[in-house]
């Protein structure tokens, strides 16, 4: 960064509370993306939980990770810009961290900037229960992110920060782009998602997390035989649905604003 001001085209989107900025008309493989993203996410800038860079039908996340909510947001933006969109349409997109094409079913939701977006999520690579110290966690690995499920009711009381530190240590010898920890309360089907992006060397508590809800859904299917549930997130809801061995995540998306951002 040489002191010049960069002007970027942005779209601010709210997928179930997980505020996402998409940057358009920019080199999606620019080496400064992590730095730019950190700046954009600040409270004094556009204030968001994550940033993605879009070109045609591809979404490149700030740390090269996969993100379900950003993918739902991107498909909803395509619908918002699509002159032929009326009530419902399917959009096929790709996202960093995932080699498969992603299919997203976008429907209207009461206003021209509001949608419901249902995405077919990637299959997990592995699903297991592990012990870290004396805590039991689910571990669901995807190609773009690994998610840990921490069942609050089935573990002894501890601080979330302690679990985050233990997970970082557990992964210290692994090459990964991002990990999540879903702090899950089975009594009221709610969760508090935490996501750490290695490239940025920082993590945040998100207001909702689609890939984390997917991981939780696979975990609940295997260990609790629950193949559909609306999971309450800190600032909204996401529903996972398992049909014919495929996992779908459905929920609201709102296009909030678009314009220029100065970095």
Curated annotation (Swiss-Prot):
The active site is at residues 67, 209. Disruption phenotype: Knockout of the gene results in a small but reproducible lag in growth compared to wild-type strain during exponential phase. Depletion of metal ions from the media results in the growth curve of the wild type organism approaching that of the deletion mutant. Its EC number is 5.1.1.24. Gene3D superfamilies: Diaminopimelate Epimerase, Chain A, domain 1 (3.10.310.10). The keyword Isomerase applies. It is an enzyme of class 5 (isomerase). Keywords: Isomerase. Cofactor-independent isomerase that catalyzes the reversible conversion of L-histidine to D-histidine. May play a role in growth of F.nucleatum. This is Histidine racemase. It comes from Fusobacterium nucleatum subsp. nucleatum (strain ATCC 23726 / VPI 4351).
């Amino acid at each position: 960064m040489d002191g010049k001001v960069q002007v970027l085209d942005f779209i601010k989107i709210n997928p179930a509370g997980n505020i996402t900025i998409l940057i358009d008309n920019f080199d999606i493989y620019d080496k400064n993306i992590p730095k730019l993203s950190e700046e954009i996410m600040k409270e004094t800038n556009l204030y968001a939980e994550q940033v993605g860079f879009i070109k045609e039908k591809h979404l490149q996340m700030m740390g090269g990770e996969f993100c379900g909510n950003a993918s739902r947001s991107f498909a909803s933006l395509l619908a918002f810009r699509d002159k032929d969109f009326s009530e419902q349409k399917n959009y096929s997109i790709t996202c960093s961290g995932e080699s498969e094409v992603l299919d997203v079913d976008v429907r209207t939701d009461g206003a021209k900037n509001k949608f419901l977006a249902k995405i077919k999520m990637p299959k997990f690579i592995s699903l297991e229960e592990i012990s870290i110290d004396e805590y039991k966690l689910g571990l669901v690995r995807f190609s773009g992110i690994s998610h840990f499920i921490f069942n609050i009711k089935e573990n002894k009381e501890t601080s979330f920060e302690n679990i985050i530190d233990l997970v970082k240590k557990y992964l210290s010898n692994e090459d990964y782009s991002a990990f999540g920890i879903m702090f899950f309360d089975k009594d009221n089907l709610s969760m508090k998602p935490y996501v750490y992006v290695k490239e940025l060397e920082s993590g945040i508590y998100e207001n909702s997390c689609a890939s984390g809800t997917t991981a939780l859904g696979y975990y609940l299917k295997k260990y609790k035989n629950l193949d559909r549930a609306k999971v309450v997130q800190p600032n909204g809801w996401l529903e996972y649905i398992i049909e014919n061995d495929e996992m779908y995540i459905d929920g609201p998306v709102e296009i909030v604003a678009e314009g220029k951002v100065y970095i």
